Amino acid sequence: MQDSKEQRVHGVFEKIYKNYDQMNSVISFQQHKKWRDKTMRIMNVKEGAKALDVCCGTADWTIALAKAAGKSGEIKGLDFSENMLSVGEQKVKDGGFSQIELLHGNAMELPFDDDTFDYVTIGFGLRNVPDYLTVLKEMRRVVKPGGQVVCLETSQPEMFGFRQAYFMYFKYIMPFFGKLFAKSYKEYSWLQESARDFPGMKELAGLFEEAGLKNVKYHSFTGGVAATHIGWK
């Protein structure tokens, strides 16, 4: 079951990589950038920090971490899609971010020693992994004591009416946008499935705690369509 999901997700991102950034802006109405900016303000990344961005994709959050940590920082980005990483590599090169290293790897088995990073992030990637808890435990393992594990992800609005409209949007309109702008109806149908099945905010906070993280907090964005969860080691 896990292998099947992993293979399917890998195929999705290997196909949509060229239009991924554009589609993120289209389907979120540009809100994903604001959510990430707000999350970065909450994190308050220190200059010179060591950070890992798991499921980094095209490296937007990786680059945001590098900007916050400065030239003295050390930032790693990891993703299992080589095509997505190729887009990220070009951004890193164009921006001159010498403090960034992008790696091809698996979020379920992070290739780093225990207690390595000050911050470990995952943005719009946790819902696509085979096992949420395994990845959160791996993120906790590689973060330093006192460090932050941070997840920015789609969530499930709780307000009646808005919740129903949200799921209608994900089920019908988002795949249509995928077909219209990226010629990828099937792939964007999968993304709505993964968002639909992802835990709500309280349930995800519980998984953070089950992974061994402390003082878990979450922040809801845009009526609950997305949320940031932060836990400390």
UniProtKB/Swiss-Prot annotation:
It catalyses: a 2-demethylmenaquinol + S-adenosyl-L-methionine = a menaquinol + S-adenosyl-L-homocysteine + H(+). Gene3D superfamilies: Vaccinia Virus protein VP39. GO terms for biological process: menaquinone biosynthetic process; methylation. Pathway: Quinol/quinone metabolism; menaquinone biosynthesis; menaquinol from 1,4-dihydroxy-2-naphthoate: step 2/2. Its EC number is 2.1.1.163. Methyltransferase required for the conversion of demethylmenaquinol (DMKH2) to menaquinol (MKH2). HAMAP family: MenG_UbiE_methyltr (MF_01813). This is Demethylmenaquinone methyltransferase. It comes from Bacillus subtilis (strain 168). The lineage of its organism: Bacteria, Bacillati, Bacillota, Bacilli, Bacillales.
